[in-house]
Amino acid sequence: MRLRNKPWAQKLVAEHPEVILNEPDPDKKINWEERFEDFSKPLAIEIGSGKGQFITTLAKEHPEMNFIGVELQTTAAGMILRTKLEEKIDNLQLMCADAANIAMYLPENSVDIVYLNFSDPWPKTRHEKRRLTYKSFLDKYRQILKPEGHLEFKTDNRGLFEYSLVSLNNYGMKFDYVSLDLHHADDEIFERNVETEYEHKFAAKGNPIYCLHAHFVK
C-alpha cells in the first residue's frame, strides 16, 4: 500500500546520507565496511520494510548482527529512519531503492538471511515478474546469500504463498520450514517470530499467516 507523501520524510532522508542510501547508483560500489561499525557480523536484509516495525525490532533484539532495510517508498523509509535515529539503532542501515537492483548493491555471498514480509502479491498474471519470489529475484538472492544463508517469507495472501512454494521448488530450493498458520503453530519459529505492522493487523482479524524458510542448493 502506497503511503501519502510526507515532505518531512524526504527532508529527513536527504539529511542523513550516512545511514540511508537514497536511490543509489547501481553501477557505483557501496562501501559497507564504512557504513557499519563491524561489517564482519552476520548480515540480514529485509526487502520491502514498510514502516519498519519488523526490521527495527529485530535489530534491537540482535546487536550481534547487522541489518539492512530496503524500502522503495521515501515516506516509509523516512519513518524507519526516524525510529532508527530516535532509538539509536546503530546496527541498522537503510536503502531507499528498487529491490530489482539488490545484487548490484551488496557483495556476492555476503548475506545470511533475506526477509520478505507481506510483499505486494501482484495478482495479475501480466505482473508475475514483479513478485519478489519470481525466478529473476531468486537469481539475485542466490548471488548475495552466503552458501549457508537462507530466505524467510511471510504473507497473508494464500495465492502468493502457493505461487511462491511452486516458484522456489521449481528453482531447486529446499524448504526448511512451511506453515499454513504461523500464529497457531506451537513451535520455535513462532516463539521467536517478530511481527510486522501488517501481520499484527491481519492476525488480529483471525487471518492465517503463511510462512516458509528455504535455502539454495549450491
Curated annotation (Swiss-Prot):
Q: Which domain of life is it from?
A: Bacteria
**Active site positions:** 120
Named in its record, the pathway it takes part in is: tRNA modification; N(7)-methylguanine-tRNA biosynthesis
- Alphabetically ordered keywords of this record: Methyltransferase, S-adenosyl-L-methionine, Transferase, tRNA processing
Catalytic reactions of this protein: guanosine(46) in tRNA + S-adenosyl-L-methionine = N(7)-methylguanosine(46) in tRNA + S-adenosyl-L-homocysteine
Q: Entry's InterPro entries?
A: SAM-dependent_MTases_sf, tRNA_(Gua-N-7)_MeTrfase_Trmb, tRNA_methyltr_TrmB_bact
Give the EC number(s) listed in the UniProt record.
2.1.1.33
Protein residues bound to S-adenosyl-L-methionine: 46, 71, 98, 120
Q: Is the keyword Transcription regulation assigned to this protein? A: no
Transferase as a keyword of this entry, yes or no, is yes
Select a single GO molecular function from the record's annotations and give it.
tRNA (guanine(46)-N7)-methyltransferase activity
Q: Where is this region: Interaction with RNA?
A: 126-131
Annotated transmembrane regions = none
GO cellular component labels: tRNA methyltransferase complex
In this chain, substrate is annotated as bound at 124, 156, 196-199
| HAMAP family listed in its UniProt record | tRNA_methyltr_TrmB
Q: Which NCBIfam families match?
A: PRK00121.2-2, tRNA (guanosine(46)-N7)-methyltransferase TrmB
What biological function has been recorded for the protein in this entry?
Answer: Catalyzes the formation of N(7)-methylguanine at position 46 (m7G46) in tRNA.
The record's section on PANTHER family has: 3-DEOXY-D-MANNO-OCTULOSONIC-ACID TRANSFERASE/TRNA GUANINE-N 7 - -METHYLTRANSFERASE, PENTACOTRIPEPTIDE-REPEAT REGION OF PRORP DOMAIN-CONTAINING PROTEIN
- Which family does the record assign? Belongs to the class I-like SAM-binding methyltransferase superfamily. TrmB family.
Q: What is this protein called?
A: tRNA (guanine-N(7)-)-methyltransferase
Instruction: Tell me the classification of the organism that encodes this protein.
Output: Bacteria, Bacillati, Bacillota, Bacilli, Lactobacillales
